[in-house]
Amino acid sequence: MTRSRLLLVGVITITSAAAATAYHASHPANRTAFSTRAGSIAPAASMLEPRSGHTATLLPNGTVLIAGGMRRNQDFYKSAELYDPAVGKFQATGEMNERRVSPVAVLLRSGKVLVAGGWIGHGCTDSAELYDPSTGKFSVLASRMSTVRGDARGTLLPSGDVLITGGADHDSPGGIASAEVFRAASQTFQPVSPMHFARVAHTATVLQDGRVLIVGGRGDKVNAVAEIYDPKTARFTESGSLIIARYKHTAGLLANGGVLIAGGSDEHDWNGNLNSAEIYDPKTGKFQATSPLNDKRFKLPEEAVLLESGDLLVAGGSRQAELFDPAQGKFLVVSGSMDDARHFMTETRLRDGSVLMAGGYPNNDQATAQAWIYRP
């Protein structure tokens, strides 16, 4: 596996007594049992292409845009497809103008999707394009990012602009500190003050007050120090430290305004998978440990899915999906399982409250076209 592939980040079926019996027979006795309250997952239709390191974006019409990604190694895609929940199938749409793995993909207020950067082979790109659902086509933007970025993070700000942070470039595959904002009105990129630390495979979560929490990631080493981006000042400030430094983890905004940080890996990557979890409190600017995941997992979708119940769905990096229940402060194991542990898969909440989980690869690095549906 190439070094660049290791850095990619990024986003699960039978429920019966027999399945539960088999599960408990092959797992530690102290593991949380299947919970009917946690919902279940089942296979859905397959994508048109096997993909990992792709993007999945819910469009205003309820369909999901799947773009880019890779089959394995240097087999990168320009192609894109749409998942239609009404018929439960994937269909082709226009392809991107450049092959991309782990680009930024953000739905804009206009209904179009910004796709920027990503791995293109032995390096990254600074190019960007817009997907227009009304035409089913991608168009190249005249403006380019201030630097090439692979596995950066893109976050929609309250203003409708997009904050883009970190990632890797040709000279710093371990992460960069620079940041910029995509101005939606002018369709241009504008550099802002850099982060205090270089980061790739980090998370960026919009808080209830509109600021953005940046957590984890890797520069010269895996980082524990968090930062807050304030759109009013266009600057980053340090804000507390993780109890355990991590990258390739997931993060999710809780209904009470806190942020769950779960899983990921330490400096040892495949040999350092984590099951620990912690919660960031924006009122105190500190992290506090919470109950661990039932499975160690990394290479997760960067954003855990917030359900209508207020629970957070965490999937990927394991055959099993888990639900974090804030009221209990613990993770519940979801009934059903994927065919294998899936890394760099995506998870997207649909309009009906279910969640589409698509693609990813197991330990053999061969991506799958299979998708799954989680139902609460």
What positions do the PLM features span?
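N-terminal Sec-pathway targeting helices
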Residues: 1-10
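Generic short N-terminal amphipathic or hydrophobic helices
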Residues: 11-13, 40
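Hydrophobic alpha-helical membrane-insertion segments, chiefly the h-region
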Residues: 14-24
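Kelch-like beta-propeller repeat domains
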Residues: 22-376
